[in-house]
Amino acid sequence: MNILFKTTVLAASLLLAACNNNDDQEAQTAPSTNPSKYYQTKTPYQPQQDLKSYEQAPTGFQPVFTELVARHGSRGLSSLKYDLALYNLWKQAKAENALTPLGEQLGADLEAMMKANILLGYGVEGIRQYGYGNETMTGILEHRGIADRLLQRLPTLLNAQAPILVQSSGVDRAVDSAKFFTAELIKQQPQLKDKIVPLSYTNLSSGSVPSVEDGGVDRFKLYFHSLNADEDLAQPLSVSQQKIYDASQAYQDFEENNKDLAQKLDELSKNTQAEKTAQMVLSPIFKADFIKKLGTTGYSFSNTGSFTVTPPKGEQITEKGKGKNTIASAVDAAAYIYELYSISGGMKDELKGINFDKYMPLEAAKFYAEFNDANDFYEKGPSFTESNQVTSEIAQGLK
Protein backbone atom coordinates (compact mmCIF):
# COMPACT_ATOMS: atom_id res chain seq x y z
CA MET A 1 0.00 0.00 0.00
CA ASN A 2 1.36 3.43 -0.95
CA ILE A 3 0.32 6.71 0.62
CA LEU A 4 1.61 9.90 -1.00
CA PHE A 5 0.97 13.40 0.30
CA LYS A 6 1.32 16.35 -2.05
CA THR A 7 0.75 20.06 -1.69
CA THR A 8 -0.97 20.55 -5.02
CA VAL A 9 -2.85 17.46 -6.22
CA LEU A 10 -5.84 15.62 -4.80
CA ALA A 11 -6.65 12.20 -6.19
CA ALA A 12 -7.07 8.70 -4.86
CA SER A 13 -7.61 5.20 -6.12
CA LEU A 14 -10.83 3.44 -5.17
CA LEU A 15 -12.67 6.76 -4.88
CA LEU A 16 -10.94 7.66 -1.62
CA ALA A 17 -11.01 11.37 -2.38
CA ALA A 18 -13.12 12.32 0.60
CA CYS A 19 -13.64 11.70 4.26
CA ASN A 20 -15.88 12.15 7.23
CA ASN A 21 -15.11 14.33 10.22
CA ASN A 22 -15.83 11.69 12.85
CA ASP A 23 -13.12 9.75 14.65
CA ASP A 24 -15.50 6.85 15.21
CA GLN A 25 -14.45 4.04 12.89
CA GLU A 26 -18.02 2.75 12.71
CA ALA A 27 -19.50 6.08 11.66
CA GLN A 28 -21.05 6.33 8.21
CA THR A 29 -21.20 9.78 6.64
CA ALA A 30 -23.70 10.42 3.89
CA PRO A 31 -22.54 12.45 0.90
CA SER A 32 -23.09 16.18 1.17
CA THR A 33 -26.03 17.66 -0.72
CA ASN A 34 -25.19 21.26 0.19
CA PRO A 35 -25.13 23.67 -2.78
CA SER A 36 -21.73 24.99 -3.79
CA LYS A 37 -20.41 28.02 -1.94
CA TYR A 38 -17.70 28.46 -4.58
CA TYR A 39 -14.72 28.08 -2.26
CA GLN A 40 -12.80 26.74 -5.29
CA THR A 41 -9.61 24.91 -4.19
CA LYS A 42 -10.34 25.81 -0.55
CA THR A 43 -13.49 23.66 -0.47
CA PRO A 44 -13.34 21.29 2.53
CA TYR A 45 -13.39 17.62 1.58
CA GLN A 46 -16.71 15.76 1.64
CA PRO A 47 -17.58 12.11 0.96
CA GLN A 48 -18.76 11.71 -2.61
CA GLN A 49 -21.08 8.80 -1.86
CA ASP A 50 -22.18 6.56 0.97
CA LEU A 51 -19.48 4.06 1.85
CA LYS A 52 -21.94 1.16 1.56
CA SER A 53 -22.63 2.01 -2.08
CA TYR A 54 -19.05 1.43 -3.29
CA GLU A 55 -18.56 -1.47 -5.69
CA GLN A 56 -17.51 -4.65 -3.94
CA ALA A 57 -14.76 -6.97 -5.16
CA PRO A 58 -16.14 -9.77 -7.38
CA THR A 59 -16.72 -13.14 -5.78
CA GLY A 60 -13.46 -15.04 -5.46
CA PHE A 61 -11.30 -11.91 -5.60
CA GLN A 62 -9.83 -9.73 -2.89
CA PRO A 63 -7.97 -6.39 -2.86
CA VAL A 64 -4.18 -6.71 -3.01
CA PHE A 65 -3.05 -3.10 -3.47
CA THR A 66 -4.28 0.47 -3.09
CA GLU A 67 -2.63 3.84 -3.58
CA LEU A 68 -3.76 7.21 -2.27
CA VAL A 69 -2.42 10.53 -3.56
CA ALA A 70 -3.79 13.29 -1.36
CA ARG A 71 -3.41 17.00 -0.93
CA HIS A 72 -2.82 18.39 2.55
CA GLY A 73 -5.92 19.00 4.62
CA SER A 74 -7.85 22.26 4.75
CA ARG A 75 -5.55 25.05 5.89
CA GLY A 76 -5.52 28.67 6.93
CA LEU A 77 -4.09 31.56 4.95
CA SER A 78 -0.56 30.97 3.68
CA SER A 79 0.79 34.24 5.10
CA LEU A 80 -0.21 37.66 6.45
CA LYS A 81 -1.22 39.35 3.20
CA TYR A 82 -4.89 39.64 2.10
CA ASP A 83 -6.09 40.06 5.67
CA LEU A 84 -3.60 42.77 6.65
CA ALA A 85 -4.02 44.74 3.41
CA LEU A 86 -7.78 44.75 3.90
CA TYR A 87 -7.33 45.71 7.54
CA ASN A 88 -5.26 48.73 6.51
CA LEU A 89 -7.96 49.69 4.01
CA TRP A 90 -10.66 49.23 6.64
CA LYS A 91 -8.85 51.48 9.13
CA GLN A 92 -8.72 54.27 6.55
CA ALA A 93 -12.43 53.88 5.83
CA LYS A 94 -13.12 53.92 9.57
CA ALA A 95 -11.14 57.14 9.96
CA GLU A 96 -13.20 58.77 7.19
CA ASN A 97 -16.54 57.56 8.56
CA ALA A 98 -16.95 55.67 5.27
CA LEU A 99 -18.25 52.38 6.68
CA THR A 100 -21.78 51.03 6.50
CA PRO A 101 -23.21 49.15 9.51
CA LEU A 102 -21.99 45.91 7.89
CA GLY A 103 -18.60 47.49 7.25
CA GLU A 104 -18.27 48.33 10.94
CA GLN A 105 -18.32 44.59 11.65
CA LEU A 106 -15.52 43.86 9.19
CA GLY A 107 -12.75 45.28 11.38
CA ALA A 108 -13.33 42.88 14.27
CA ASP A 109 -13.74 39.99 11.84
CA LEU A 110 -10.42 40.80 10.16
CA GLU A 111 -8.75 40.93 13.57
CA ALA A 112 -10.23 37.54 14.39
CA MET A 113 -9.01 36.15 11.07
CA MET A 114 -5.45 37.37 11.69
CA LYS A 115 -5.43 36.08 15.26
CA ALA A 116 -6.74 32.67 14.19
CA ASN A 117 -4.01 32.32 11.56
CA ILE A 118 -1.17 33.54 13.77
CA LEU A 119 -2.17 30.93 16.37
CA LEU A 120 -3.11 28.20 13.90
CA GLY A 121 -1.98 24.89 15.38
CA TYR A 122 -0.92 26.47 18.68
CA GLY A 123 -0.77 23.69 21.27
CA VAL A 124 -2.05 21.07 18.81
CA GLU A 125 -0.16 17.77 18.91
CA GLY A 126 1.14 16.94 15.46
CA ILE A 127 1.57 20.55 14.26
CA ARG A 128 5.31 21.16 14.11
CA GLN A 129 5.21 24.97 14.06
CA TYR A 130 2.07 26.98 14.73
CA GLY A 131 1.11 29.92 12.53
CA TYR A 132 0.04 30.82 9.01
CA GLY A 133 -0.13 28.00 6.48
CA ASN A 134 -1.00 25.21 8.89
CA GLU A 135 -3.88 22.79 8.74
CA THR A 136 -7.05 23.74 10.53
CA MET A 137 -8.98 21.36 12.76
CA THR A 138 -11.16 20.63 9.73
CA GLY A 139 -8.02 19.68 7.79
CA ILE A 140 -6.82 17.39 10.56
CA LEU A 141 -10.17 15.60 10.72
CA GLU A 142 -10.25 15.26 6.93
CA HIS A 143 -7.16 13.05 6.91
CA ARG A 144 -8.21 11.14 9.99
CA GLY A 145 -11.52 10.58 8.23
CA ILE A 146 -9.84 9.31 5.06
CA ALA A 147 -7.98 6.76 7.19
CA ASP A 148 -11.22 5.67 8.87
CA ARG A 149 -12.96 5.18 5.55
CA LEU A 150 -10.01 3.24 4.16
CA LEU A 151 -10.12 0.85 7.10
CA GLN A 152 -13.83 0.31 6.55
CA ARG A 153 -13.51 -0.01 2.79
CA LEU A 154 -10.55 -2.43 2.67
CA PRO A 155 -10.38 -4.26 6.00
CA THR A 156 -8.80 -7.42 4.59
CA LEU A 157 -6.05 -5.49 2.78
CA LEU A 158 -5.08 -3.58 5.93
CA ASN A 159 -5.05 -6.81 7.92
CA ALA A 160 -2.51 -8.35 5.55
CA GLN A 161 1.24 -8.37 6.10
CA ALA A 162 2.04 -5.88 3.33
CA PRO A 163 3.84 -2.67 4.38
CA ILE A 164 2.19 0.74 4.30
CA LEU A 165 4.61 3.04 2.48
CA VAL A 166 4.20 6.76 3.18
CA GLN A 167 5.84 9.73 1.45
CA SER A 168 5.27 13.47 1.37
CA SER A 169 6.69 16.55 -0.30
CA GLY A 170 8.37 17.52 2.97
CA VAL A 171 6.32 20.72 3.29
CA ASP A 172 5.11 21.07 6.88
CA ARG A 173 1.38 20.79 6.23
CA ALA A 174 1.88 17.80 3.92
CA VAL A 175 4.02 16.01 6.50
CA ASP A 176 1.49 16.80 9.22
CA SER A 177 -1.40 15.56 7.04
CA ALA A 178 0.40 12.27 6.49
CA LYS A 179 1.03 11.92 10.21
CA PHE A 180 -2.61 12.56 11.12
CA PHE A 181 -3.59 9.92 8.55
CA THR A 182 -1.21 7.32 9.96
CA ALA A 183 -2.05 8.31 13.55
CA GLU A 184 -5.67 7.45 12.86
CA LEU A 185 -4.71 4.10 11.34
CA ILE A 186 -2.70 3.33 14.47
CA LYS A 187 -5.45 4.57 16.79
CA GLN A 188 -8.01 2.28 15.19
CA GLN A 189 -5.66 -0.69 14.67
CA PRO A 190 -2.50 -0.38 16.82
CA GLN A 191 -0.86 -3.37 15.12
CA LEU A 192 -0.55 -1.31 11.92
CA LYS A 193 2.20 0.80 13.49
CA ASP A 194 4.78 -1.88 12.72
CA LYS A 195 3.76 -1.91 9.04
CA ILE A 196 4.15 1.83 8.39
CA VAL A 197 7.36 2.80 6.58
CA PRO A 198 9.31 4.92 7.36
CA LEU A 199 9.14 4.97 11.14
CA SER A 200 9.10 8.78 11.19
CA TYR A 201 5.42 8.73 10.16
CA THR A 202 4.34 6.72 13.19
CA ASN A 203 4.79 9.49 15.76
CA LEU A 204 3.04 12.87 15.98
CA SER A 205 6.01 14.32 17.85
CA SER A 206 7.64 17.32 16.17
CA GLY A 207 10.98 15.59 16.74
CA SER A 208 10.02 12.78 14.38
CA VAL A 209 10.73 14.36 10.99
CA PRO A 210 10.52 12.40 7.71
CA SER A 211 13.39 13.04 5.32
CA VAL A 212 14.83 12.20 1.94
CA GLU A 213 17.31 9.95 3.73
CA ASP A 214 14.67 7.76 5.39
CA GLY A 215 12.55 7.65 2.22
CA GLY A 216 9.72 9.67 3.73
CA VAL A 217 10.22 12.71 1.47
CA ASP A 218 10.39 12.77 -2.33
CA ARG A 219 10.27 16.26 -3.80
CA PHE A 220 10.82 14.95 -7.34
CA LYS A 221 7.60 12.98 -7.06
CA LEU A 222 5.56 15.34 -4.90
CA TYR A 223 6.95 18.89 -5.20
CA PHE A 224 8.02 18.86 -8.82
CA HIS A 225 6.58 22.30 -9.63
CA SER A 226 9.12 24.11 -7.45
CA LEU A 227 12.45 22.26 -7.48
CA ASN A 228 15.54 24.41 -6.92
CA ALA A 229 19.31 24.06 -6.84
CA ASP A 230 19.77 24.73 -3.13
CA GLU A 231 17.41 22.00 -1.96
CA ASP A 232 17.43 19.51 -4.81
CA LEU A 233 20.97 19.39 -6.21
CA ALA A 234 22.80 18.60 -2.98
CA GLN A 235 23.24 15.00 -4.18
CA PRO A 236 23.88 13.66 -7.71
CA LEU A 237 20.64 13.08 -9.60
CA SER A 238 19.53 9.94 -11.37
CA VAL A 239 18.65 10.20 -15.06
CA SER A 240 14.93 10.33 -14.26
CA GLN A 241 15.43 12.91 -11.51
CA GLN A 242 17.45 15.11 -13.86
CA LYS A 243 14.60 15.03 -16.38
CA ILE A 244 12.14 16.06 -13.69
CA TYR A 245 14.45 18.80 -12.44
CA ASP A 246 14.87 20.19 -15.96
CA ALA A 247 11.11 20.03 -16.51
CA SER A 248 10.59 21.90 -13.24
CA GLN A 249 12.92 24.69 -14.33
CA ALA A 250 11.09 24.91 -17.66
CA TYR A 251 7.75 25.14 -15.87
CA GLN A 252 8.94 27.84 -13.48
CA ASP A 253 10.29 29.83 -16.42
CA PHE A 254 6.97 29.38 -18.23
CA GLU A 255 5.06 30.64 -15.20
CA GLU A 256 7.28 33.70 -14.78
CA ASN A 257 8.26 34.67 -18.33
CA ASN A 258 6.03 33.13 -21.00
CA LYS A 259 4.52 35.93 -23.09
CA ASP A 260 1.59 33.85 -24.33
CA LEU A 261 0.67 32.98 -20.76
CA ALA A 262 1.00 36.60 -19.64
CA GLN A 263 -1.23 37.71 -22.50
CA LYS A 264 -3.89 35.13 -21.69
CA LEU A 265 -3.90 36.02 -17.99
CA ASP A 266 -4.10 39.70 -18.88
CA GLU A 267 -7.13 39.00 -21.07
CA LEU A 268 -8.80 37.22 -18.18
CA SER A 269 -8.09 40.11 -15.80
CA LYS A 270 -9.88 42.56 -18.12
CA ASN A 271 -13.19 40.77 -17.77
CA THR A 272 -15.87 43.46 -17.96
CA GLN A 273 -17.82 41.71 -15.22
CA ALA A 274 -15.03 42.32 -12.68
CA GLU A 275 -15.93 45.95 -11.92
CA LYS A 276 -19.63 45.17 -11.60
CA THR A 277 -18.88 42.27 -9.27
CA ALA A 278 -16.55 44.42 -7.17
CA GLN A 279 -19.34 46.96 -6.66
CA MET A 280 -21.68 44.14 -5.66
CA VAL A 281 -19.22 43.10 -2.94
CA LEU A 282 -18.05 46.51 -1.70
CA SER A 283 -21.24 48.61 -1.74
CA PRO A 284 -22.77 46.89 1.30
CA ILE A 285 -19.51 47.46 3.24
CA PHE A 286 -18.14 50.88 2.24
CA LYS A 287 -19.79 54.15 1.27
CA ALA A 288 -19.80 54.99 -2.44
CA ASP A 289 -17.44 57.98 -2.24
CA PHE A 290 -14.78 55.88 -0.52
CA ILE A 291 -15.05 53.09 -3.09
CA LYS A 292 -14.47 55.65 -5.86
CA LYS A 293 -11.21 56.74 -4.22
CA LEU A 294 -9.66 53.26 -4.29
CA GLY A 295 -6.59 53.29 -6.53
CA THR A 296 -6.19 57.06 -6.51
CA THR A 297 -3.28 58.82 -4.80
CA GLY A 298 -3.15 57.82 -1.15
CA TYR A 299 -5.73 55.08 -1.55
CA SER A 300 -3.64 52.00 -2.28
CA PHE A 301 -3.29 49.64 0.65
CA SER A 302 -0.62 46.97 1.14
CA ASN A 303 0.10 44.34 3.77
CA THR A 304 2.50 46.64 5.60
CA GLY A 305 2.81 46.83 9.36
CA SER A 306 2.20 44.07 11.87
CA PHE A 307 -0.40 42.48 14.10
CA THR A 308 0.10 41.21 17.65
CA VAL A 309 -1.91 38.58 19.53
CA THR A 310 -1.77 37.03 22.98
CA PRO A 311 -2.09 33.22 23.10
CA PRO A 312 -3.37 31.24 26.11
CA LYS A 313 0.07 31.09 27.76
CA GLY A 314 0.20 34.88 27.92
CA GLU A 315 3.20 35.73 25.75
CA GLN A 316 2.78 38.15 22.86
CA ILE A 317 3.24 36.99 19.27
CA THR A 318 3.72 39.51 16.46
CA GLU A 319 3.43 38.77 12.75
CA LYS A 320 4.78 41.26 10.21
CA GLY A 321 3.49 41.84 6.70
CA LYS A 322 5.88 41.93 3.77
CA GLY A 323 4.24 44.77 1.86
CA LYS A 324 4.12 42.78 -1.37
CA ASN A 325 0.33 42.49 -1.71
CA THR A 326 -1.44 45.70 -2.71
CA ILE A 327 -5.04 46.77 -3.13
CA ALA A 328 -4.88 49.27 -5.99
CA SER A 329 -8.51 49.24 -7.12
CA ALA A 330 -12.01 48.30 -6.11
CA VAL A 331 -11.55 45.09 -8.08
CA ASP A 332 -8.53 44.19 -5.94
CA ALA A 333 -10.37 44.92 -2.70
CA ALA A 334 -13.30 42.70 -3.60
CA ALA A 335 -11.00 39.90 -4.76
CA TYR A 336 -9.15 40.04 -1.42
CA ILE A 337 -12.44 39.71 0.43
CA TYR A 338 -13.15 36.61 -1.65
CA GLU A 339 -9.82 35.12 -0.54
CA LEU A 340 -10.86 35.46 3.10
CA TYR A 341 -14.34 34.17 2.36
CA SER A 342 -13.02 31.08 0.60
CA ILE A 343 -10.48 30.21 3.31
CA SER A 344 -13.09 30.63 6.05
CA GLY A 345 -14.94 27.50 4.93
CA GLY A 346 -12.18 25.34 6.39
CA MET A 347 -11.66 27.47 9.52
CA LYS A 348 -14.98 26.99 11.31
CA ASP A 349 -13.39 25.89 14.59
CA GLU A 350 -10.75 28.60 14.60
CA LEU A 351 -13.07 31.48 13.68
CA LYS A 352 -15.53 30.50 16.42
CA GLY A 353 -18.76 31.41 14.68
CA ILE A 354 -17.50 34.37 12.67
CA ASN A 355 -19.02 34.08 9.21
CA PHE A 356 -17.54 35.78 6.15
CA ASP A 357 -20.55 34.75 4.04
CA LYS A 358 -22.17 38.10 4.87
CA TYR A 359 -19.44 39.90 2.93
CA MET A 360 -19.60 37.79 -0.22
CA PRO A 361 -22.79 37.47 -2.30
CA LEU A 362 -23.01 33.98 -3.77
CA GLU A 363 -23.13 35.36 -7.32
CA ALA A 364 -19.86 37.21 -6.70
CA ALA A 365 -18.26 34.11 -5.17
CA LYS A 366 -19.17 32.19 -8.32
CA PHE A 367 -17.48 34.85 -10.46
CA TYR A 368 -14.23 34.76 -8.46
CA ALA A 369 -14.16 30.96 -8.37
CA GLU A 370 -14.57 30.81 -12.15
CA PHE A 371 -11.90 33.48 -12.59
CA ASN A 372 -9.44 31.53 -10.42
CA ASP A 373 -10.28 28.31 -12.23
CA ALA A 374 -9.53 29.96 -15.57
CA ASN A 375 -6.18 31.25 -14.31
CA ASP A 376 -5.28 27.84 -12.92
CA PHE A 377 -6.26 26.17 -16.20
CA TYR A 378 -3.60 28.14 -18.07
CA GLU A 379 -0.95 28.32 -15.33
CA LYS A 380 -1.21 24.83 -13.83
CA GLY A 381 -3.67 22.81 -15.88
CA PRO A 382 -3.78 21.72 -19.55
CA SER A 383 -2.90 25.31 -20.59
CA PHE A 384 -2.74 26.00 -24.36
CA THR A 385 -1.18 24.14 -27.28
CA GLU A 386 1.83 26.47 -27.47
CA SER A 387 2.80 25.57 -23.89
CA ASN A 388 4.12 22.24 -25.24
CA GLN A 389 2.86 20.28 -22.22
CA VAL A 390 5.20 22.14 -19.86
CA THR A 391 2.54 21.95 -17.14
CA SER A 392 2.35 18.16 -17.30
CA GLU A 393 5.96 17.17 -18.02
CA ILE A 394 6.88 18.08 -14.45
CA ALA A 395 4.67 15.23 -13.19
CA GLN A 396 6.47 12.46 -15.07
CA GLY A 397 7.71 11.04 -11.76
CA LEU A 398 4.17 9.91 -10.97
CA LYS A 399 4.02 7.57 -13.97
For each feature predicted by the language model, list its residue ranges:
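C-terminal motif of bacterial Sec signal peptides marking the signal peptidase cleavage site
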Residues: L15-A18
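Sec-dependent signal peptide recognition
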Residues: N2-L10
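Residues in flexible loops and secondary-structure boundaries
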Residues: V9-S13, H143
